[in-house]
């Protein structure tokens, strides 16, 4: 794994731990719900045995496929430890690896229980539909017996609907946590898998094993969404087989009940679980994986291979060609939603025009920024070497105020990127290729506007970190009596000079980009402030959307303010006053 991506396992394992902790804590609620499921499953089995009905072939194939993906994933986790840790012949590492990977199987096994629970519910709904069709088309059954069978099916259908809602309610927070865990797993492994697939250090067997495990987990999680979609479909399946001549009061009442009872399986009330949302999540995974891969290409030192140069060229051409078309389609969808005041439409056009121009300049000027990042690398190596020699090791050796600045900036950046993705995720009405392409392009381009200023911030943050290291070490040298410490003044002088030159060069290269970004932030800030007032007071808007827009506006303002504040911090550390020095210490 590249050294600059060493933090990704911490993110992935932290997410895994949070999901596993919630699964284990909430187990008692699921166990009580599974007891109710067992009773209704026995009832469905008894009715199917009485009538001679069998399980639907589609449900049976899904169950076999889910069992295969579960078995393969669990065995792969355990066998991977036995194969790779056995070579080292270290029992401590073998035990730790087994403990970790057996814990990871909890994430897969728990979704299997969710799948099996909904599979039994879908099987019950399918039996109700088959039995209802037989009752309606039967000529030998009298009306009294038909009425009795209809009442039994009605009661079974109602129990199945209530059980499905209970399953969704108890498993909702857990499936939300597991969905986030799978999202992080997919983004990180997709990016790292792409990097390793072009590497010669790993064998073909390891690449094949990793890709097969990745796709097995993807299919395994897809089946969870598909079974939810199947339950909803079977619960309200159209009854075209009921002719008007065979309609009775009981049958009419049942059909009215079934058509008016809709089963919406929402995860924590946030979004429906179906194939449509699955495809949108896959599109989001692709967007974030591309963003991580772009970060990898930049951090490895620019376009050094034909593959990376071709990728960057094609990505820029496709983005600049398709983005105006996508923005025009978004404008059409925006107009079709509801009737807006004319000034809202004008400001919306201004906002998209400015954003496109900024993105155009950002992509065209990428080579200059890559040059600045290349010049930062030797300086960073020198800075890390000096920090290690002075006793300031790693991130813990950095001043606390600088660490807080970095963490807050990462939080605002992550918030803006993730919330923009979620907003676009929920704004799609139907899953068609146009909406998926629109989602991909808008997600990627919105991230461009947020990620490019982050490079400027990180460069200034490292420069401020270097100036602070020089200042702290200089205070120690001045107060020291050792001649060895006093000889370090030349090293500090050289480091201070390099930091100053690099800061001036980065500011020169990034100046047009930051001027364009400032104009973009100014336009978006003015327009969103106006929109916030209009949507809050003049138009009927949900309270949650008002809160979301307000928080988004203030987080965006804080995100940009941190860039200006970082410039002030770098200048302050460069010109740090030496009031603590006495005249005797100056020589």
UniProtKB/Swiss-Prot annotation:
Signal peptide: none annotated. Glycans are attached at residue 159. InterPro entries: 7TM_chemorcpt. The keyword Thylakoid does not apply. GO terms for biological process: sensory perception of taste; signal transduction. It is a multi-pass membrane protein. It is found in: Cell membrane. The chain crosses the membrane at residues 5-25, 63-83, 98-118, 278-298, 310-330, 404-424, 519-539. Pfam families: 7tm_7. GO terms for cellular component: plasma membrane. Residues 26-62, 119-277, 331-403, 540-587 are extracellular. Its main location: membrane. Keywords: Cell membrane, Glycoprotein, Membrane, Receptor, Transducer, Transmembrane, Transmembrane helix. Residues 1-4, 84-97, 299-309, 425-518 are cytoplasmic. Belongs to the insect chemoreceptor superfamily. Gustatory receptor (GR) family. Gr22e subfamily. Probable gustatory receptor which mediates acceptance or avoidance behavior, depending on its substrates. This is Putative gustatory receptor 59b. It comes from Drosophila erecta (Fruit fly). The gene is Gr59b.
